[in-house]
Amino acid sequence: MDEQALLGLNPNADSDFRQRALAYFEQLKISPDAWQVCAEALAQKTYSDDHVKFFCFQVLEHQVKYKYSELSTAQQQLIRETLLSWLQAQMQNPQPEKTFIRNKAAQVFALLFVTEYLTKWPKFFFDILSVVDLNPRGVDLYLRILMAIDSELVDRDVVHTSEASGLENTLIKDTMREQCIPNLVESWYQILHNYQYTNSEVLCQCLEVVGAYVSWIDLSLIANDRFINMLLGHMSVEVLREEACDCLFEIVNKGMDPVDKMKLVESLCQVLQTAGFFSIDQEEDLDFVARFSKLVNGMGQSLIVSWTKLIKNGAVKNAQEALEAIETKVPLMLQLLVHEDDDISSNIIGFCYDYLHILKQLPVLSDQQKANVEAIMLAVMKKLTYDEEYNFENEGEDEAMFVEYRKQLKLLLDRLAQVSPELVLASVRRVFSATLQNWQTTRFMEVEVAVRLLYMLAEALPVSHGAHFSGDVSKASALQDMMRTLVTSGVSSYQHTSVTLEFFETVVRYEKFFTVEPQHIPCVLMAFLDHRGLWHSSAKVRSRTAYLFSRFVKSLNKQMNPYIEEILNRIQDLLALSPPENGYQSLLSSDDQLFIYETAGALIVNSEYPAENKQALMKDLLTPLMERFKVLLEKLMMAQDEERQASLADSLNHAVGFASRTSKAFSNKQTVKQCGCSQVYLDCLQTFLPALSCPLQKDVLRSGVRTFLHRMIICLEEEVLPFIPSASEHMLKDCEAKDLQEFIPLINQITAKFKMQVSPFLQQMFMPLLHAIFEVLLRPAEDNDQSAALEKQMLRRSYFAFLQTVTGSGMSEVIANQGAENVEQVLVTIIQGAVDYPDPIAQKTCFIILSKLVELWGGKDGPVGFADFVYKHIVPACFLAPLKQTFDLADAQTVLALSECAVTLKTIHLKRGPECVQYLQQEYLPSLQVAPEIIQEFCQALQQPDAKVFKNYLKVFFQRAKP
């Protein structure tokens, strides 16, 4: 072997040596006999370096995995012998191999097993066991090999490459069950028995193996007195009990007859209870309690599955026994649910949830069951509470886990509300009222959870459209009382961000309360508009409040009229466009400011003011933005530093975004025109459009202005049209693929909306736009530049979408009036799009365009020469495209393209009649060497009045035609 290259295997080697080692590995993988050198090195213990040994196993692994079938029988025998002699040598080694080497060896054994067990090596396990006997090192390797085999055969995390490998794995398992599983199980029993006092590591490994295999072997081999008693014995040994717990969990989880499962679980529980495992509070080892909690959860859920099956089968007596068995586990479940360790509590939630599901199905609940429901409710309320360690300013992994845990508890609360809505409402009301009575002297986490529970009731007790304050009188009045307490108690002043946020979340969730008791709106508005909300010291609170305030105002727009000017005055400072200089930190981020602008726009538009007042208020809102925009644009034109340019461009873009966001409140009932605001937005357009001619930061500025234009086309309608030509001219200068791709939807929007009104403009800019597109598409790019290829593909799609919009909007004369040469160029590109590019989305669009053009121009009075074009180009395209190898009829998008291809052929037949059939019969299809009877069949299908019949036929036609 190349000793120099092997030096690079050491993790501390320099990069040149490491590169050489990698290259050597690739070389050995390709070489037909290099593996033999590695096999020999392993068998003869040539190398003592661990990394070299690992390397040798890697080479062998590659050989077995990818090239085994190429080896001769003698070579395959050599690999078997090498591995067995290596295994034999491990018995005598003074020191065991490193774990990573043992694991890699086990993987190679497992790969060889999967390859050879059914054919050449049926005695695989007997050979291994005869080598390892009861030698602890041998047993360790035997167990690792078993785990590696389980991974290959059944591990859910391993993606098996094909259906064939899945079937082969099933066959291997079936054969193992018949031939060797009882012997393997016996070997596990012997290992567990012989090593129980001497080698805890081997015992843990063995328990892991039993847990893994129990899912697919005959359960009676494990679930018997001999085995279970031994496992229960291990539960009392500190170093073994976690693995024993997991092993029992796998046994309990195994599917089996419901009555047998019930008996198994009950016998386990009896022994565990007698041994004192149910006394959770005595146990200090939290890792073990977490595993035990998972086991109890498994036992509980197994009993519930048994109960469900028995009820379904009508076995009433057995079902009753199962229910009693479940009930006896509830006290233990509750102990685990309220455990201070959230992992332990989380592990039992599944059982708890399913238990409540049973109670929901029972016609009446016993007193004990009602008490259980109440106990679960108390547990949920307790466990929802934050602990002292929760870091609100810098939330890390622990905090994220608690948030997830809270989501699980929320599901429990929702399920509780399905079982007993009255209890849930009464419990929350009790806790809420008691806490808010003394909120000033109560710890933040208790105040937060009290408000949080009120918030959660909205989903736990669902109603349509948030109508919590009508309908059921007792529920409505309870919620009304709590909301009244929330907004009048002063708790919004609590000095903790979690309480503040929960307050605002809750008032917004129950916004309908303020339509019932509108007298509370001013005090809530004040909370939003002072140091408790938008001026809070915490950026997190300010940010969330900006969004919630917007929702609050919009949902109560009918109640807002008396407060509009006061609100607009108070938010004035928050509307300022943050100057991108001097490291100035504004109160809100630009994203948060979007919500404030949206709120301001909504207040003005939805107000009961006359149009002139609305116009004046909107002008006051947007004029400072326009003035600031002009100043910043001038600064950008003069800025030298690129970072400064980028920051100014961002600010300009924000200004455009803010103006755009104010227009969100307009609707069909409240149009810009009706509100008298057209001129303000036209002024904005005039202010923003000069940014398009700025040579700096083009991408950012164009993107912002383009988005604003999209919005104004909707809001201002034809009033926007005078601005479009010059805007388009600027946007077509110095274009990249992405610019064009984003510009075309703007033109599509104008075309689809205004149709004939924009015909002169479209005719004028049609060829300049096409030239810009073609110029970008024809630019050379590196063969392997995937992003450039993707950009071109997207631009091509946009181009065809544009042509589709033009033809689909009844504006085909825009194309027809471009002169014969240009028209032909456009038509050729559509044919190319339909045939030459393997992009089914573009192909579908091209066939839609072709159908439309045939419909418009394909009759007797169509443009001169178009009928020839139909027969020379469009008809062939309908055959050449689907015949291409890249046209995959198993792909959904491609099938849609074929469907449009069928429509095109049907349209040609509709417009040209018998002439089209004659052309297909006598000229075109014979030129493709189609058999006469198939030609006849094709033409008959084409002439069917039902288009669907032809679409289905066409798919079959091409499936037959393709090799």
Swiss-Prot record:
Localization per Swiss-Prot or TrEMBL: Nucleus; Cytoplasm
Pfam family, one: IBN_N
Residues with PTM N6-acetyllysine: K635
Keywords: Acetylation, Cytoplasm, Nucleus, RNA-binding, Transport, tRNA-binding
One cellular component (GO) term of this entry: cytosol
Protein's UniProt keywords contain Acetylation: yes
SUPFAM superfamilies, alphabetized: ARM repeat
N-acetylmethionine modification, residue list: M1
Gene3D superfamilies according to UniProt: Leucine-rich Repeat Variant
GO BP annotations, alphabetical order: intracellular protein transport; tRNA re-export from nucleus
GO molecular function, one term: tRNA binding
Superkingdom of origin: Eukaryota
Primary location group: nucleus
Keyword tRNA-binding on entry: yes
TM regions (residue ranges): none
Subunit and partners: Found in a complex with XPOT, Ran and tRNA. Probably found in a complex with nucleoporins. Interacts with Ran and tRNA in a GTP-dependent manner.
Family, per entry: Belongs to the exportin family.
Protein role: Mediates the nuclear export of aminoacylated tRNAs. In the nucleus binds to tRNA and to the GTPase Ran in its active GTP-bound form. Docking of this trimeric complex to the nuclear pore complex (NPC) is mediated through binding to nucleoporins. Upon transit of a nuclear export complex into the cytoplasm, disassembling of the complex and hydrolysis of Ran-GTP to Ran-GDP (induced by RANBP1 and RANGAP1, respectively) cause release of the tRNA from the export receptor. XPOT then return to the nuclear compartment and mediate another round of transport.
Full protein name: Exportin-T
Organism of derivation: Mus musculus (Mouse)
